[in-house]
């Protein structure tokens, strides 16, 4: 009887170890790739000028979210949210800034649900939701959290169920799971960090980007986080260098030898994109290929003027600033063919990564 129990325990332990190993997911080795011309690896499908919402035009995009055939453009200078179709057509304004219940004030983050039907806005006072088809206000909620004003990024799982990110956790988790007045830590870390992007949907799966000094992407499942993707760099920030407070963060931020963090990420069915703050305090791009397990890694070229903002099943999307595109860029001919030099409005770029196999 004792022998049988012992064998059962061994089997359970083995199964548990197998399950944990499976949760490690993909690892992309970025130490052997050094892309110096992204034009050799990117196929442009479309490059479309965005229609102006009015005579004031468009300012710089602080953030864009894409889903359900639509894009929300957060105009930082105008403090407004505009809805577009993914062919560049202006669809309307979403909400407005103000003091009423239906208006946002001091936007911190925006998040689109997995179906692309509802936009959520995190502002100084709570979480608002808007219908993507009409742009009309739907609801407002303020999670019952101490120090709610310290949360800067969020994701929506369902009504009253959110993940929230605090860059200065003061002993609590950087990422918490809040559901109808109750919450728990999902990721415990005492490091001071940037309020970079933290959450995005890939299909029906909610993805959670790692904290400052780490380089992985988790998925949220069954009330916890499971490792989905890990990126390997030749010069990751050492554990002892991770900033514990604002002063040490300022010092580490000035050091030029290390990869610091993942600033943003998105996915297609095959490819995983990450925007990484690398050495020399410069941004680098990673495109990891699920099919081959290989990664493309290289410096983001500022002369291309392209910012990757999202993905769907087959393609990535980016916002192109025509005035930043140099004559050496692979995008210059698209700009000349698609827009007026007298009125350089932002452009929506749809592209694929070329197969490397």
Residue ranges and their predicted role:
Residues 252-296, 304-306:
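Loop/turn-rich, solvent-exposed surfaces of beta-rich toroidal or solenoidal domains
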Residues 48-79:
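Beta-strand-rich domains and repeat architectures in extracellular enzymes and scaffolds
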Residues 32-58:
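A short helix->beta-strand "capping" segment at the edge of beta-propeller domains
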Residues 234-248, 291-313:
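Conserved blade-ending motifs and adjacent loop-strand segments that build the rim/top face
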Residues 66-68, 112-115, 156-159, 201-203, ...:
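Residue-level detector of Asp-centered blade-edge/turn motifs that repeat once per structural unit
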Residues 60-63, 105-110, 147-156, 193-199, ...:
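Repeated scaffold domains used in trafficking and secretory/extracellular systems
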Residues 123-158, 164-168, 185-188:
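Asp-box/WD-like beta-propeller blade repeats and closely related beta-sheet repeat scaffolds
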Residues 51-56, 90-116, 145:
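Blade-loop segments of beta-propeller domains
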